[in-house]
Amino acid sequence: MKEKKLGNTDIIIPAIGQGCMGIGGDFTADNSADTEQIRALELGIDLGMTLIDTSELYANGHSEELVGIVSKGRRDQLFIATKFAPENNSYEGIIKSAERSLKNLNTDYIDLYQVHWPNPSIPIAETMLAMEKLVDDGKVRYIGLSNFSAKEMIDAQNVLKSKYIVSNQVEYNLFDRFIEQSILPYCESVNSTVIAYSPLDKGRAVEGEKRIKLLNNIAVAHNSTPAQVAIN
């Protein structure tokens, strides 16, 4: 597994992690596939995908609960990231969300806590002060964002007194390259990691006769798979 540094930290994370949207259900809990999904997460860990990203929104917290089950006995081997719902972007809302996530994840700290979406109705200063408080209290190790524009990242960073935003999780794949306009250049300029979600466009990147033919030709030339080509 290729590895990379997380932002301006000394933390090394795998280049490919496990996204947990759909694990445990969609937006409500669904226990029917728990056993299979736990095995899938465990296999991913065995293959080196020790970064696991979830959210309190996924399956109404059940996704976090499954990650908590998987992490039992090997918490120190994992880098666990989670997020909170935008309606909870207030100071009090974030503190309460963090406590719920800690319980769901069966852990006493979250490696990377991310603001899932900006919420224009709640001042970013209030949001980031709560994030900084969680770091100061030892409940969160690093602060991240998700779905933030470059300007929104700047506004968020300017609020923080002594902490840094180490990442921004955004959609990025062969067919959605919007972040290359301003988000990616900004992240590179401040050494903040871009965590790409939907890197295969939910499977669509390797679907379709023309796409498959092109990716297959490149894959054969480089002894890779079409999916590896799409990600690289």
Predicted regions and their residues:
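A short, structured active-site edge motif that brings together acidic residues
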Residues: 77-89, 112-116, 170-171
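Beta/alpha (TIM)-barrel catalytic core signal, keyed to glycine-rich beta->alpha loops juxtaposed to Asp/Glu
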Residues: 118, 122-232
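Short, well-ordered coil/turn segments that N-cap beta-strands
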Residues: 11-16, 48-51, 74-78, 107-111, ...
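Acidic (Asp/Glu)-rich catalytic clusters
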Residues: 8-10, 68-75, 99-106, 135, ...
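N-terminal binding-site loop/beta-alpha segment at the start of enzyme catalytic domains
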Residues: 1-78
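Active-site groove signature of glycoside hydrolases
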Residues: 105-121
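Short, acidic/polar
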Residues: 30-44, 90-105, 153-154
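Conserved, mostly hydrophobic/aromatic
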Residues: 6, 18, 52, 67, ...
